[in-house]
Amino acid sequence: MATTKSFLILFFMILATTSSTCATLGEMVTVLSIDGGGIKGIIPAVILEFLEGQLQEVDNNKDARLADYFDVIGGTSTGGLLTAMITTPNENNRPFAAAKDIIPFYFEHGPHIFNYSGSIFGPMYDGKYLLQVLQEKLGETRVHQALTEVAISSFDIKTNKPVIFTKSNLAKSPELDAKMYDICYSTAAAPMYFPPHYFITHTSDGDIYEFNLVDGAVATVGDPALLSLSVATRLAQEDPAFSSIKSLDYKQMLLLSLGTGTNSEFDKTYTAEEAAKWGPLRWLLAIQQMTNAASSYMTDYYISTVFQAHHSQNNYLRVQENALTGTTTEMDDASEANMELLVQVGETLLKKPVSKDSPETYEEALKRFAKLLSDRKKLRANKASY
């Protein structure tokens, strides 16, 4: 896991130094990345609803959807579920869920998904309801049918390797054209919370592939932004739609990364004296919390540093609440009271400044992003018409 992240970091540091091309809006590659976090996915859902509303307002089109504006949408765990909801087509080949439908989905299904199984030795939740509702909502849709490029991560515990589901890699790896509900359950199957997911796929050549998957956070440690950028880079190099991009650099990337919130005390903090008394189980729980928090911080640090170094800091926006308290820190508290609190967290976050050094609020930054996304979409459409 550390090796994979180190490779991605090195890859993007090298990429950032290879070109100083001045990009036009029409040549930009747009990326949306959504973190994992269980029921805390309500927080980025609030942000997505606001952004989609802004896009509809800017383009005077109530049917505008996020998938119309982003070249790559990536997510892990609950972020993978959100990715599927806004990219899976309905019978009219439009996203089956608008951004405003996501929060009601959590309120309706969250309490049933996080319904304690009562098992002492198995996972906390049996996952049956989650798989059932995913099958009902996503049907038989497969990766290749997604309305834009997706990047949803999981981890195969049999091969001990990450599995990344994307459209652009299907020509080389047709076995990855799995059903979206299998992918969504797999990326959400957090160890200790849900059982791992087994399924098979068949290729046109008759080959059978089996998967034994758990939560995508095992592969991406909760924040899929680097993964999403990697997929976007490959897409820009291989997709004819981006043929005008001769040499990709960060001036040609527009990245929106949505977090699911961290504790005001950087998740839970401990003293050396306290930790010295822990056994293996206590350490296991603490390490998971520490790893997720540290990874989210470091990923943001790496990406923001590179964007700033190439004078493209306005092309990257990380939306994250770092002051969660009480029940809002829990990924599996699906009580109505806590979900209402999470909605309030998201709404309050919109009014907060992006950083201590800037008076710009997240709401203002998202409006700016909406304008960029709209302008870029129009420029590309005009170019395609000639």
Swiss-Prot record:
Active site: 77, 215
UniProt keyword annotations, A-Z: Coiled coil, Glycoprotein, Hydrolase, Lipid degradation, Lipid metabolism, Plant defense, Signal, Storage protein, Vacuole
Cystine bridges: none
Record carries keyword DNA-binding: no
Keyword Nucleotidyltransferase on entry: no
Compartments, as annotated in UniProt: Vacuole
Coiled-coil regions, chain positions: 321-384
Residues carrying covalently attached carbohydrate according to the record: 115
Positions of short motif GXGXXG: 36-41
Main location: other
A GO CC term assigned to this protein in UniProt: vacuole
This protein's domain notes: The nitrogen atoms of the two glycine residues in the GGXR motif define the oxyanion hole, and stabilize the oxyanion that forms during the nucleophilic attack by the catalytic serine during substrate cleavage.
Physiological role: Probable lipolytic acyl hydrolase (LAH), an activity which is thought to be involved in the response of tubers to pathogens.
Protein's UniProt name: Patatin-2-Kuras 2
Lineage of the organism: Eukaryota, Viridiplantae, Streptophyta, Embryophyta, Tracheophyta
